[in-house]
C-alpha cells in the first residue's frame, strides 16, 4: 500500500437528501475505503446510522464498499460532495394529530360537564347532540345531527334543510353519508325556467293588448247605441257621448297592418333608414328636378313638381282615388244606426197602408222600376268613371290595405 496516500487528507461534505440534518464536514484520507468511511460516519454522524443501512452517492454513482477514495474522488476538487442515504428499517409510528387529541379532550370535557349537571338540568328531546364517526379507510370525522338520524323520513321529505346544513358546516365536519350533495337547480332547469317565464310574459302582453283593443271597440259601440235607447224616453235628454264625437271628428285609421301575433306591423324600411339613405333620396330628387328645370320651361317645371307632389300624397294616403265600398259606407254607419228605428216604424206603417188599399202588386212593380232606374248610371257618369279609372290606373298604388 502506498504510504504517501496515508498522509494526504481529504475533506468530504456529507449531505442528507431529506434535509433533516445540516451538511456535515468529515476529514479522512485518500487510502480509506468506502466501508471504512461508513464505519466512521456511524460514529460521528448525528443520527448514528448503521453501516449496512448507509448508501453513499458521489457524482450520481453509488459507491461500493471495496473501492478506495483515491480511485473515486477527483484530485482537482478541494471539497467533495457526498450524499448519504439511510434506509429506515423500523419507521417510527405516526404521532397522533393535535386535532385528535383536542377532539378527545373536548369529548371528555363535555361528558364530565354533562355528568356534573345531570341532577339539575334535563336535556330536551329537540336538543342537537353531535356524534363522532370515524371512518376506517380515510380516517375522517363526520358530525351529524341526532334529529336527522332519528327521523330519516322527514329528512328525505325536506332535502333542502340538509343542503342548508351542508353549506354551513364547521371545519372538520363532513357531509352526512345518507344524503347526496346536489345543487338546488341545474343549469338546464334554470334555462327552462327562464324560457317559460319569457313565454308567459309574452302571452300576458298579447292578451293585454287584445283586451285593450276589444274594450275600446266595445266602448265605442255602447256609446253609439246609448242615444238610441234613450231617445224614446219622454222628458229625458240623451247624455252626450264624447267618445263618439271624438271618433267622428278624428279620422279612423282602418289600414293598420297586424302581424300574426296580434300586434301592429313595424315597417322596418322606415325604421332602418339612416341619414345616408335620406341624403341619397334627396340627391336623386335634386338631380331629377335639375334636369327638368334646365331642359324645359318654368311652367313645365311647376307642372312636374305638382304631379310629383300629388303622386307622393296619394301614396302617403292623403288622396285615395279608389276607395272600397265598405270604406265609403263607413261614415254613414252612425246615421244609419240612428235612423234605423224610425225607418222600421215607417216601413211598418207603409205596409199596413198598402195592405189596406190592396195595392201590393202595383207598388211592387213601381218599386222595381225605381230601383232599376237608380242603379242604371248615365252617359256622363260612365264616361267620367272610365276616364278617372284609366288615368288613376297609371299611378302606382300605395301599400296594400289589410282589413282586420
UniProtKB/Swiss-Prot annotation:
Keyword line: Membrane, Transmembrane, Transmembrane helix, Unfolded protein response
GO biological process, one term: spermatogenesis
Organism per entry: Mus musculus
Zinc in keyword set: no
Recorded topology in the membrane: Single-pass membrane protein
InterPro entries hit by this protein: HERPUD1/2, Ubiquitin-like_dom, Ubiquitin-like_domsf
Major location category of this protein: membrane
Name of the protein in question: Homocysteine-responsive endoplasmic reticulum-resident ubiquitin-like domain member 2 protein
Gene3D superfamilies associated with the record: Phosphatidylinositol 3-kinase Catalytic Subunit, Chain A, domain 1 (3.10.20.90)
Biased composition annotated in UniProt, kind: Low complexity: 88-97, 109-126
Domain spans labelled Ubiquitin-like: 10-89
Annotated region described as Disordered, given as residue ranges: 86-153
Annotated compartments: Membrane
Disulfide bonds: none
Family matches, as PANTHER family: HOMOCYSTEINE-RESPONSIVE ENDOPLASMIC RETICULUM-RESIDENT UBIQUITIN-LIKE DOMAIN MEMBER 2 PROTEIN (PTHR12943:SF5), HOMOCYSTEINE-RESPONSIVE ENDOPLASMIC RETICULUM-RESIDENT UNIQUITIN-LIKE DOMAIN HERPUD PROTEIN FAMILY MEMBER (PTHR12943)
Cited function: Could be involved in the unfolded protein response (UPR) pathway.
Amino acid at each position: 500500500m502506498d504510504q504517501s496516500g496515508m498522509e494526504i487528507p481529504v475533506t468530504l461534505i456529507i449531505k442528507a437528501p431529506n434535509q433533516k440534518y445540516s451538511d456535515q464536514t468529515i476529514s479522512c484520507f485518500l487510502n480509506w475505503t468506502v466501508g471504512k468511511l461508513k464505519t466512521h460516519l456511524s460514529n460521528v454522524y448525528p443520527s448514528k446510522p448503521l453501516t449496512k443501512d448507509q448508501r453513499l452517492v458521489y457524482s450520481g454513482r453509488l459507491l461500493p464498499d471495496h473501492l478506495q477514495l483515491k480511485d473515486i474522488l477527483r484530485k482537482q476538487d478541494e471539497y467533495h460532495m457526498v450524499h448519504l442515504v439511510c434506509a429506515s428499517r423500523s419507521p417510527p409510528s405516526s404521532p397522533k394529530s393535535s386535532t385528535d387529541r383536542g377532539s378527545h379532550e373536548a369529548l371528555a370535557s363535555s361528558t364530565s360537564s354533562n355528568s356534573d349537571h345531570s341532577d339539575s338540568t334535563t336535556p330536551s328531546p329537540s336538543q342537537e347532540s353531535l356524534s363522532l364517526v370515524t371512518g376506517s379507510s380515510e380516517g375522517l370525522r363526520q358530525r351529524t345531527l341526532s334529529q336527522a338520524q332519528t327521523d330519516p323520513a322527514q329528512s328525505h321529505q325536506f332535502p333542502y334543510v340538509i343542503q342548508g346544513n351542508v353549506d354551513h358546516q364547521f371545519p372538520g365536519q363532513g357531509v352526512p353519508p345518507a344524503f347526496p350533495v346536489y345543487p338546488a337547480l341545474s343549469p338546464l332547469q334554470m334555462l327552462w325556467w327562464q324560457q317559460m317565464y319569457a313565454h308567459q310574459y309574452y302571452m300576458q302582453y298579447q292578451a293585454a293588448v287584445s283586451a285593450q283593443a276589444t274594450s275600446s271597440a266595445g266602448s265605442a259601440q255602447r256609446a253609439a247605441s246609448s242615444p238610441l235607447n234613450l231617445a224614446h224616453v219622454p222628458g229625458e235628454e240623451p247624455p252626450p257621448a264624447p267618445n263618439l264625437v271624438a271618433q267622428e271628428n278624428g279620422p279612423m285609421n282602418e289600414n293598420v297592418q297586424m302581424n300574426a301575433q296580434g300586434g301592429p306591423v313595424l315597417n322596418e324600411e322606415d325604421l332602418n333608414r339612416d341619414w345616408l339613405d335620406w341624403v341619397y333620396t334627396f340627391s336623386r330628387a335634386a338631380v331629377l328636378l335639375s334636369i327638368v328645370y334646365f331642359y324645359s320651361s318654368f311652367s313645365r317645371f311647376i307642372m312636374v313638381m305638382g304631379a310629383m307632389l300629388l303622386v307622393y300624397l296619394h301614396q302617403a294616403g292623403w288622396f285615395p282615388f279608389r276607395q272600397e265600398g265598405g270604406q265609403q259606407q263607413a261614415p254613414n254607419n252612425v246615421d244609419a244606426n240612428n235612423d234605423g228605428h224610425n225607418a222600421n216604424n215607417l216601413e211598418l206603417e207603409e205596409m199596413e197602408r198598402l195592405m189596406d188599399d190592396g195595392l201590393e202588386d202595383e207598388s211592387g212593380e213601381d218599386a222595381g222600376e225605381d230601383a232599376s232606374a237608380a242603379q242604371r248610371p248615365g252617359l256622363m257618369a260612365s264616361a267620367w268613371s272610365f276616364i278617372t279609372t284609366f288615368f288613376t290606373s297609371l299611378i302606382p298604388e300605395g301599400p296594400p290595405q289589410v282589413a282586420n
